[in-house]
Amino acid sequence: DYYSGTISGDALDIVSRTVMTEVGSGFNDEAIKAQAVAAYTNIKNNESRGSTASVILAPQASSRVRSLVKEVLGQAVYYNGSYALTTYYASSAGRTASASNVFNTDYPYLESVETPFDAEYDQYYGSESYFSSDYMRSAIESYYGITLSSNPENWFVITAYEDGQYVGSMSIDGQAS
């Protein structure tokens, strides 16, 4: 249903279209099948908790993706007899964050690990964006309702890191966090 955002259909179609969105058809067979198992498990995990999985579906899946998904459809990842939480995303800046930092819930099988292939496969890995201090001043002052000092080097101070070396907290010119 377009207005409610609810999609219904058979599992093969939904998982195939999810896989098509996440990895497309350019990866090797085993990578596509692994994504299919993760997507299927994610949907079943949500259903088992009385929730609806949030997935993005391609308009259609290629015949190759559909065929590979069909080979593994129904296979799932379990932890202690229940469907595992199998969140997925394209890149993690070289290291994942633990579930406890992302979801505020500990899943012992979702710990921070190095992801050395991000640099090889993520087109944005290592990219940088630059903004003028005037632009940043305007955006920050407008959003936070504060007046920044004259020294841009004081505007952002990291006060704590989480696992994966992600920023856990920061101070904005000593006035907001």
Predicted feature descriptions by range:
Residues D1-S177:
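Conserved, single-site charged/polar hotspot
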